[in-house]
Curated annotation (Swiss-Prot):
Membrane-crossing residue ranges in chain numbering: none
Protein name per UniProt: 35 kDa gas vesicle protein
Lineage, uppermost ranks: Bacteria, Bacillati, Cyanobacteriota, Cyanophyceae, Synechococcales
Function per UniProt: May confer stability to the gas vesicle shells. Gas vesicles are small, hollow, gas filled protein structures that are found in several microbial planktonic microorganisms. They allow the positioning of the organism at the favorable depth for growth.
Species of origin: Dactylococcopsis salina (strain PCC 8305)
The family this protein is said to belong to: Belongs to the gas vesicle GvpC family.
């Protein structure tokens, strides 16, 4: 029984270590994915900020160049303004498209990571359910084996106790018969001692109460040995005194 419990405890600790290791792997994977997403987001943000900075610089340079150019060439101001407006519109359109593409890619990456985390959580839940099922099965088997072992031990102990009691009772009966045949002067004292021993033995072996033992003692001369109290006294009076 101790070995089964130790084996069960070792299996439980092994499962616990496996679950802990699996949780650690999941946390490391989740942390790695989050770090990767954070790095990508920071890189995209830095690129966007750099692009915006370059755009502002370009816009400032363009504005300065345009102002100088317009100052130098007043005759072609409208044409240059239209051209610059087209370039700015195209640049803004490209920037918006790039930003939308980056945002869409980031959303797709976030969805993919969320699906991976959900799959890992489902797998961990299934493993925990399987572990609990195996644990309940192991506990049930251990209880059944322990109960069967206890029943076998109790049956064997009962058989040994019955055999010992029968043997001891036979020896007591034989000794009482021998004492009855010899009719010695001290037979009465020996018989009383044997009666008391038999009563104590009955209490110890069969678990009788003190009142039951007294009933057995009161009924012993006539019921067990077939003698009445007067026969008992007559035998004692007719028995020579032997030291």
């Amino acid at each position: 029984m101790v070995s089964l419990r130790e084996q069960w405890n070792e299996q439980a600790r092994e499962r616990q270590r496996e679950i802990s290791a699996r949780k650690t792997e999941i946390e490391e994977a989740r942390s790695s994915i989050q770090k990767e997403l954070q790095a990508q987001y920071e890189a995209r943000l830095a690129a966007t900020q750099q692009l915006q900075s370059e755009l502002r610089q370009f816009y400032n340079n363009l504005a300065n160049d345009t102002a100088g150019f317009l100052e130098r060439t007043r005759t072609t101001r409208e044409q240059m303004a239209q051209k610059l407006e087209q370039e700015l519109t195209q640049l803004i359109t490209d920037l918006e498209n790039n930003t939308a593409a980056l945002l869409q890619e980031a959303n797709q990456e976030r969805v993919r990571v969320s699906q991976q985390q959900k799959a890992l959580a489902i797998e961990l839940k299934n493993q925990l359910a399987q572990f609990h099922e195996q644990l309940e099965t192991s506990v049930g088997n251990w209880r059944q084996e322990t109960q069967e072992q206890q029943q076998q031990t109790a049956a064997q102990l009962r058989e040994d106790l019955n055999a010992f009691s029968a043997n001891l009772m036979a020896q007591v009966e034989k000794l009482l018969i021998n004492l009855e045949e010899t009719r010695t002067a001290n037979a009465q004292q020996q018989r009383e001692a044997l009666f008391n021993f038999r009563r104590q033995l009955t209490v110890d072996v069969w678990g009788e109460t003190e009142s039951d033992s007294l009933k057995v003692e009161e009924n012993t001369p006539s019921d067990v040995w077939g003698e009445t109290e007067s026969d008992f006294l007559e035998v004692e009076e007719n028995t020579p005194f032997v030291t």
